[in-house]
A protein has these predicted regions:
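A short, well-ordered alpha-helix in the C-terminal region of glycosyltransferases
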Residues: 280, 287, 294-309, 315-321
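Conserved donor-binding/catalytic core segment of Leloir-type glycosyltransferases
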Residues: 119, 151-171, 177-181
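Acidic anion/phosphate-binding donor-loop and adjacent secondary structure
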Residues: 101-104, 130-131, 135-157
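Aromatic "clamp/platform" in nucleotide-sugar-dependent glycosyltransferases that forms part
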Residues: 233
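Short alpha-helical segment that forms part of, or immediately flanks, the ligand-binding pocket
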Residues: 219, 241-246, 262-263
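Membrane-proximal helix-turn-helix segments that form the acceptor-binding/catalytic region
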Residues: 59-63, 97-119, 125-127
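Short hydrophobic beta-strand element within catalytic cores of glycosyltransferases
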Residues: 250-255
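Conserved acidic donor-binding segment of nucleotide-sugar-dependent glycosyltransferases
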Residues: 267-278, 287-292
Length: 327
């Protein structure tokens, strides 16, 4: 099958959204499909190889004929739907609710009302679209099971972990900082480790910080963490908590409708779900500090849950089957 991923007007850079698209494209190449990434400019992505053919669009003649073309960002939809029919059946792959790029009404008008078939990456996003009167299909990106797995036995010391991200306040990294401060004031065996795309913030409460770690460093990092804090409130399918769970970290999240964790976190089974306020969040983290048996039970269940969601290969095969239904 010939597949085009359109990143027109959005581009590729060192961020989670670009990484997901590139890993999906690479997986489809490995599955013997012809895959292209259609871009408005030069790729700024340096986190790994791009196996798909990257095309910098100059004229429409640069675009190959294809079976399907997939818009991958809110701002790529308008440009993509104007492309020739020979580019294939048009899909939109929604992987977040990007209110930092558009208002909700703009999303409805420019993305949801566009004449494309909608794919989402999570239950939360599917429910959001349904509440607005739009149908969609769930295709998750999957995970790399060979990259992150349990390596060590954890000690009684508790290491809290989280994503440090200041660009979008909806990531709520401030909740992680607040939680660590509150619990460090009560317990002596607590540390906080964080990673992110920001340079080291040099905040005293953070005991260890990794800047843009590669897969090997990230795997080791997750294995040193006991409890992963995931307070984000505006996600599609939140990836770092899944990676942490593969290393048998226990995740604490919230019941925010777009937490991005409802696909894989079931309260007290595969993680802990706090109410969507910071006091409840701190209380759930403290439960895990005080109860190592609960941590042990949930950590095993959590890893199994992420494995059950499937590998990248399994999920991209599902995507291809969906494409085949519309060709």
């Amino acid at each position: 099958m010939k597949i085009i991923f359109s990143v027109l007007n959005t581009g590729l850079g060192n961020n989670g959204g670009s990484k997901t698209i590139i890993e999906s494209a690479n997986t489809l190449v490995n599955l013997n499909h012809d895959v292209y990434i259609l871009d408005s400019g030069k790729s700024m992505y340096t986190w790994g190889p791009i196996k798909a053919q990257h095309i910098k669009l100059k004229t429409k003649r640069d675009i190959p004929d294809a079976d399907v073309i997939v818009s991958t960002g809110f701002k790529s939809v308008r440009a993509t739907v104007r492309l020739p029919k020979r580019c294939g059946v048009q899909f939109t792959y929604m992987r977040g609710w990007e209110l930092w790029k558009m208002s909700q009404q703009q999303i409805i008008n420019e993305v949801l009302k566009a004449p494309t078939i909608k794919i989402v990456n999570s239950i939360g996003l599917q429910q959001k679209l349904k509440s607005l009167g739009f149908e969609s299909y769930i295709i998750r990106p999957g995970n790399d099971f060979n990259s992150i797995y349990p390596m060590i036995s954890r000690t009684q010391n508790v290491v809290l972990g989280g994503l440090y991200h200041t660009k979008h306040k909806t990531k709520r990294h401030s909740w992680i900082i607040h939680t660590a401060k509150a619990l460090k004031s009560k317990y002596t065996n607590i540390q906080l480790w964080m990673f992110g795309s920001d340079s080291d913030p040099n905040i005293p409460v953070i005991d260890k910080y990794l800047y843009q770690p590669n897969k090997i460093k990230k795997a080791s990092f997750y294995n040193g963490i006991t409890v992963w804090l995931a307070p984000s409130e505006l996600e599609g399918l939140h990836i770092p908590p899944q990676e942490a769970m593969l290393a048998e970290c226990v995740v604490v999240t919230t019941d925010a409708p777009l937490s991005g964790t409802s696909d894989y976190i079931s309260h007290e089974k595969t993680g802990l779900v706090a109410k969507n306020d910071i006091f409840s969040f701190v209380a759930q983290v403290e439960r895990l500090i005080r109860d190592p048996l609960l941590r042990s039970k949930i950590s095993k269940n959590g890893r199994k849950m992420i494995i059950d969601l499937g590998s990248r290969e399994t999920n991209m095969q599902k995507m291809v089957k969906l494409f085949e239904e519309f060709i």
